């Protein structure tokens, strides 16, 4: 949805895929002039370096917008997640690698091109579980909280180079690969608890990401925009 939102506004997009090559290729087929895809394993720094280099080569220009939205091996099913007594340090390391170390590496690889142009837009994907930890996603939430801190501290470092760094935090989305295991009654309960009586969709989250990359957000950096139908007040 994020890729399609940018393409719908005329942007050129390079999509990183790990296991979902077919999904990425479908988008490329729909926008053959402005979309490309390349393999990316966010757990591997060498893969990140290769992806960053290929992103510049595919359109003969350094990217000026980066969206960090990849997720490593996680299923949004509260009943199946380990509780405090059982969760392991390794599970925390896995999520920190995916949600903190990978965005850090992506930013470091693409920052020089942005700084050279004096313009860059970085959007990290967070979660509303910072404010509303109603399910035991301990490892996921902790890693995303670390990413929020990185968003804020990097906004200070990169601002003088013309680069903004922001975060968009959704709740449970209806529906993504990660939320496909979520029981229907959970979606219903969330919808009932929001002022808008709805569960946020991937398209709605994508529109918020698009805002941070747009001219309307040119004076905004270091911020976390919660997009969850009003369930959590940020």
Regions found by a protein language model. Name each.
Residues 72-76, 83-95, 121-146, 151-160, ...:
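Catalytic loop of short-chain dehydrogenase/reductase
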Residues 132, 192, 196, 210, ...:
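Short C-terminal tail/terminal secondary-structure segment
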Residues 1-14:
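Canonical Rossmann dinucleotide-binding motif of NAD(H)/NADP(H)-dependent dehydrogenases/reductases
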Residues 25-27, 80-82, 160, 167-194, ...:
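A glycine/serine/threonine-rich, flexible loop-to-helix segment
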């Amino acid at each position: 949805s994020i890729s399609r939102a940018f393409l719908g506004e005329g942007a050129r997009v390079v999509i990183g895929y790990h296991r979902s090559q077919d999904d990425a290729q479908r988008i490329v087929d729909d926008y053959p002039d402005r979309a490309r895809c390349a393999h990316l394993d966010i757990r591997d720094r060498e893969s990140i370096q290769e992806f960053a280099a290929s992103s510049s080569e595919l359109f003969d220009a350094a990217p000026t917008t980066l969206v960090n939205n990849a997720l490593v091996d996680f299923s949004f099913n509260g009943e199946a997640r380990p509780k405090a007594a059982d969760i392991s340090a390794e599970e925390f390391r896995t999520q920190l690698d995916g949600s903190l170390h990978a965005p850090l590496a992506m930013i470091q690889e693409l920052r020089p091109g942005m700084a050279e142009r004096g313009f860059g837009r970085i959007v990290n994907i967070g979660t509303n579980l910072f404010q509303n930890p109603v399910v035991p996603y301990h490892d996921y939430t902790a890693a995303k909280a670390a990413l929020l801190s990185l968003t804020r501290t990097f906004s200070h470092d990169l601002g003088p180079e013309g680069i903004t760094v922001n975060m968009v935090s959704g709740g449970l989305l209806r529906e993504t690969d990660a939320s496909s295991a979520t029981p229907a009654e959970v979606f219903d309960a969330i919808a009932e608890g929001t002022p808008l009586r709805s569960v946020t969709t991937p398209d709605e989250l994508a529109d918020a990401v698009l805002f941070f990359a747009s001219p309307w957000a040119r004076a905004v950096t270091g911020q976390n925009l919660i997009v969850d139908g009003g369930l959590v007040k940020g």
